[in-house]
Amino acid sequence: MKLKAKYKQQSKVGKVVQVVSAVVDVSFAGKDLPHILNALECTINNEKIVLEVLQHIGDDIVRCLAMNSTDGLFRGAEVIDTGEQIKVPVGKSILGRILNVVGQPIDDLGPIKCDNFSQIHKDAPKFINQSTSRKILITGIKVIDLLTPYISGGKIGLFGGAGVGKTVLIMEIINNVAKAYKGYTVFTGVGERTREGGDLYKEMVGSNIIDLNKLENSKVTLVFGQMNEPPGARARVALTGLTIAESFRDMNEGEVLLFIDNIFRFTQAGAEISTLLGRIPSAVGYQPTLATDIGSLQERITSTKFGAITSIQAIYVPADDLTDPAPVACFAHLDATTVLSRKIAELGIYPAVDPLNSSSQILDANVIGQEHYSVATQVQEILQTYKSLQDVIAILGVDELSDDEKRIVSRARKIQRFLTQPFHVAEVFTGKQGRFVSLEDTIYGFKGLIEGKYDDLPEMAFYMVGSIDEAIEKSKTL
């Protein structure tokens, strides 16, 4: 009866006729069915279950996707059509809060007082309203700033298999960029570990990005649909986080940072839903609508004349296969890609970024400057030459190389080690204080390496240091 009172405006009332995991069929009398993507609500044991209409089946049945657990749901349960799509609170009232997929707070800080709500399904901004930026976003991480510079207002993907450091890297970027950032930040946890979300929240409270005493002074909103949640939550929570980021962008108060960890779980949830709906799977078992699902999300992550969204997304690579359809569907949408390699991680090189597989659209002399471009391309050439010589070294040994090749190998190994860096978020594991390296120091250090200024220093002097001055000091202790 409470639900009926809430939706007086000719609400449609239906009955549950079938429950199959997260997919629920609801029957409505008459032929006036709820629209596709409408939100339906059902209360079981004082818990509200939110359903989203996906299909019309026959004359009187709609097939829905549950946003939360269907435990306790039964045939005959009463369902109310809200008459609108899922809407979530937006604006400054949600700063410092943790929300779930339907915009409910899950941080035990009480209800959210908000008058502004926005639906999670939207079209991308019109082309005439979009804007582009060619400005570099400084992360303080040498390998990224030098070889795969990130675009302010662009889309960035961190690709990698299990356990190679995607989450640690995204946490370090949050630490280096979001803490010093004047705009707003939205972190969206999609199908990842609840523990990591808790650690991130505590870190943000500790660094005062979230001000528990005065939440409106906070600079971040967190949205979680973690791996223990139904596929409906994991498939829609990225849209919830994006909707909140869009609202901050359209407030015209500067750039917005949007972190998503992990886009693959969004794809994975879509595959689960597709199977439950009985669709014929495509390659490797993914949903036949894979490209559409990814495209509808990615095309909304864009900058407009009102403001910019800079998106940094972690993307899991199944079995370390970059040709898997899920990561392949993401590549075309991104402005910069950072590929993490297990082979590099096995060498103890952290962050385990593959400098030859990673790329950026703004690695261009007209954008980043001639000196930066020249140093970056020479570093890549040296590393590529070293890679091509590795088979010869493995069979014949270093002694069979020419003097020039030996010099290149020596510099390449030093460059490889100088690309490492101690992270602030990993201090508890490494015991080493994190380093933020300015772009000027990064270019200066690598320029000296490729010119041979530091040929006399041992390789280990360059391992896990910040600037080149630190490497010189370290060499004195070896």
Curated annotation (Swiss-Prot):
> What does UniProt give as GO cellular component?
plasma membrane; proton-transporting ATP synthase complex
Residues the record lists as binding ATP: 160-167
Reported function: Produces ATP from ADP in the presence of a proton gradient across the membrane. The catalytic sites are hosted primarily by the beta subunits.
Q: Which HAMAP family match?
A: ATP_synth_beta_bact
Is Ion transport found in the keyword set? yes
Subunit comment for this entry?
Answer: F-type ATPases have 2 components, CF(1) - the catalytic core - and CF(0) - the membrane proton channel. CF(1) has five subunits: alpha(3), beta(3), gamma(1), delta(1), epsilon(1). CF(0) has three main subunits: a(1), b(2) and c(9-12). The alpha and beta chains form an alternating ring which encloses part of the gamma chain. CF(1) is attached to CF(0) by a central stalk formed by the gamma and epsilon chains, while a peripheral stalk is formed by the delta and b chains.
Q: Name the family the entry cites.
A: Belongs to the ATPase alpha/beta chains family.
Protein's recorded name: ATP synthase subunit beta
InterPro entries the record matches:
AAA+_ATPase, ATP-synt_VA_C, ATP_synth_F1_bsu, ATPase_a/bsu_AS, ATPase_alpha/beta_chains, ATPase_F1/V1/A1_a/bsu_N, ATPase_F1/V1/A1_a/bsu_N_sf, ATPase_F1/V1/A1_a/bsu_nucl-bd
Highest taxon of source: Bacteria
Tell me where it resides. Cell inner membrane
EC top class, as a word: translocase
Record-annotated membrane-spanning stretches: none
Task: Look up and give the membrane topology term.
Answer: Peripheral membrane protein
Enzyme Commission designation: 7.1.2.2
First-listed, main subcellular location of the protein, grouped into a coarse class: membrane
Q: Does the keyword Cell inner membrane apply?
A: yes
